[in-house]
Amino acid sequence: MKQPLIELKNIERYHTNGDTLTTVLKSINLKIYSGEMVAIVGASGSGKSTLMNIIGALDVPNSGEYFIYGRNIADLSGDELAELRCRHFGFVFQRYHLLSHLTAVKNVEVPAIYAMADKILRNQRANALLCQLGLEKQLENKPAQLSGGQQQRVSIARALMNGGDIILADEPTGALDSQSSQDVLKILKDLNRKGHTVILITHDLAIAEHADRVICIQDGKIVSDTANALESMIKPQNKRTFIDDAVIEVCQQHNTEKLNRPNEKNNIDNDNKENNNGYNRNDNSFLNNPKKKLNSSILRSFNSYAESFFMAFNMMMAHKIRTFLTMLGIIIGIIAVVFVIALGEGTKKKVLDEFSSLGNNTIDIFPGKWGDESDNVHTLNMEDLELLYQQPYVQRATPVLLHIAKARYLNKTMRSLINGVSHDFFMLKNYQLVTGRLFDQNDLTLSQPVGVIDKKSAKLLFDMDDPINKIIFIDDIPLSIIGVVESSSLQQNSGKEILIWIPHSTMATRILNQSYIQQISVQLQPNVSPLKSDKAIIDLLTIKHGQKDFYTFSSSRFLQSLNKTTQALTLMISSIAFISLIVGGIGIMNIMLVSVIERTKEIGIRIAVGAKERDIRFQFLIESTMVSLIGGCIGVGCALLFGGLFSLAETSIKIQFTLSSFLIAFLCSSMIGIVFGYFPARNAAKLRPVDALSRE
């Protein structure tokens, strides 16, 4: 006995609203065989559309059994149901349900996208279907540019895209004029004569008379099931596919993916052999074309992802202003994060460079304790300096004696800071000689009245004159300027005070007449630990003095502390800037949630033509991620632009962009797109197709 293509046993469907139970379908028993054209007729509210939704796997019954190709639909997973809709069902809706932002060809291609068909072949097939339906001049028209009859033909072509073994037509002529209605009915009858099973849902008995069987449904029950003898008599016996030979040439070697499990009998193939004289009406061989190398799961998945990106981009372009306003929060947040990090890096680099110019790997030793008045504490002397010179971890050392005095040149008198140092001081502090010479050991030994001045001080004291060999007076003591050095901004005194360096022996004997020194600066060997050396110096001088009557200042330790401080400051400011990214992310989630509501019908259409939950979820996730990433790219570009403008301004701080700031920006924008886009995407994927299609 021939197995029915579709069999419903005791199907019931009801809805609950609080304590109220509304029964829509009652004990439906129905068999539909392959190749039949069946009309289900009923008034509005009779349950005919609910029955169609159950047959088309858009809805599930509350009780009863539904078999298709011999398999109970209750045993199928969500993905298997999607595969069933994708490869075996074709829907023709009363309101066409075309995607408004796609052309006629692209609308027809949608089912094949979810079947992961080759792009070129599916485009060829979509064009051929539309041409066969008389729409060769409207291939690139969007739905708004088509008449009602033309839109319904596009809907029929979409139903046939993956083969359309079973065509479900819900009031296909309800929104058409009489001529267009006759054309659509002729197409459906022609499809049935050539092998497709057609199930026609209508309220009009005149429309139903075109079918082989007329099933009347009233108040959720089948009240009659009669054959149309005339239609059965005129149906030809030799069936061929709807697509002509030109399309068949493109779509050869059918290899339809089987619905049944491998260990079950393939009723689809058997049924095809019985009814098509060796030719399969499910002409979807383009889904598995052996000439193409895209059959591997990896490449086909890649194609699917590429299509998701393309569809997401199309949706963004369809709502340009809304998309831009959505990504504006991300743009501002990325600008803030990148610019703040770059500003922090630039500030840190400037400060570290300035402090590095004071001397690398140095330790300064001061008398007394931190906070003491150094003028009243005299615990350091030249013996301490000589002792430090003997230590293996010390590369060079210099005493420092300080004195504030009036410097006079001709009729110009200025406040000056006099530093008594050794010849090692200039190398230790990274001073660069501009002109003249530095004093040497001979000058130290003979306590020569010579001095070195910095470039800024030379300009203040001598104006444009060459300072070399000029005589100045320090407290009426003559001093010959022998050299000019370049110092960093941290080494320069502010205001009108000038800096002069003289031999420490000259300072001690000619100016101060003292034996003690106010500071010792030590530069360590390159490969020693500053921390251990600092401890060794403290232990050494503590033993010599009998007590710790001094304190040290390590440049390396200070730079480490400064680096940590600037990093913490940058992190704090970046955290504040990151808040704007969070706000932008919330904006994306809000817009995507609204988008899900606005596009509910589109989601229903995509599910009806074969989209799986993961396809819908991935598409919306891609949209939110693309909005975030594009916003991130624009934000980075704006940050670079602002950084360039900032650098052109006369500021002492330079912007320092780093690769890490760009990576952080793109990581943040990607994560925001994924995190804040996930919940709207999940909501979209969880929509029931029958609910989605019913919303306006």
UniProtKB/Swiss-Prot annotation:
Gene3D superfamilies linked: P-loop containing nucleotide triphosphate hydrolases
GO CC annotation terms, alphabetical: plasma membrane
GO MF, one annotated term: transmembrane transporter activity
Domain named ABC transporter: residues: 6-244
Composition bias, Low complexity: 275-284
Aminoacyl-tRNA synthetase recorded as keyword: no
Cell location: Cell inner membrane
Its job: Part of the tripartite efflux system MacAB-TolC. MacB is a non-canonical ABC transporter that contains transmembrane domains (TMD), which form a pore in the inner membrane, and an ATP-binding domain (NBD), which is responsible for energy generation. Confers resistance against macrolides.
Protein name: Macrolide export ATP-binding/permease protein MacB
